[in-house]
Regions:
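Periplasmic OmpA-like peptidoglycan-binding domain that tethers envelope proteins to the cell wall
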Residues: 94-160
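Periplasmic peptidoglycan-binding/tethering modules of Gram-negative envelope proteins
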Residues: 20-88
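Sec-dependent N-terminal signal peptides
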Residues: 7-13
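A generic local structural motif
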Residues: 1, 75-76, 143
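Short, contiguous strand/loop micro-motifs
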Residues: 3, 64-65, 102-103
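Bacterial N-terminal signal peptides that target proteins for export
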Residues: 1-7
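C-terminal motif of bacterial Sec signal peptides marking the signal peptidase cleavage site
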Residues: 15-18
């Protein structure tokens, strides 16, 4: 083949690819309102978890027990992790700014462990979940008031 023929074939292939219709990839994983609310999000990604499932649970002051609202989020996370068996996660426990660094590191770890233990009880393999505590070092909300403190008392699940 000569260069003109190769060039013409390459142009034809490029033209054919440009004219093809893009069809969304369907996996059967996302349905209903979640699918409509989050177009373009890759199923099984951190953005999918955050947008369609929820990535964090909140705790009361000086507590590490999972509240009812947190159980709802963790139930959705367990179901999502069941769909995406190849996905591993890290749960980061966080605290508000009150208390010593040492105390908040320990409390954040108890919060991360509580979320992990709940997911494991729901059937997620413990080997897929790691935990870490950031104590008060990674606030979600800035401020020294109850609204900010409530947002910072959390455990955040991240895809790893």
């Amino acid at each position: 083949m000569n260069i003109k023929t190769v060039g013409a074939l390459a142009m034809l292939a490029l033209l054919a690819a440009a004219c093809s219709e893009d069809k969304p990839m369907t996996t059967g994983q996302t349905t209903g309102a979640a699918a409509a609310a989050a177009p373009g999000i890759v199923p099984g990604s951190e953005e999918d978890l955050k947008t369609n499932v929820g990535d964090r649970v909140f705790f009361d002051f000086d507590k590490s027990n999972v509240k009812a609202e947190g159980k709802d989020v963790l139930d959705r996370q367990a179901a999502w992790l069941g769909k995406y068996g190849q996905v591993n996660v890290q749960i980061a426990g966080n605290c508000d700014e009150r208390g010593t660094e040492e105390y908040n590191i320990a409390l954040g770890q108890r919060r991360a462990n509580a979320a992990r233990d709940y997911l494991v009880a729901k059937g997620v393999a413990s080997g897929r979940i790691t935990t870490i505590s950031y104590g008060k070092d990674r606030p979600t909300a800035l401020g020294s008031n109850e609204d900010a403190w409530k947002q910072n008392r959390n455990a955040i699940t991240e895809v790893k």
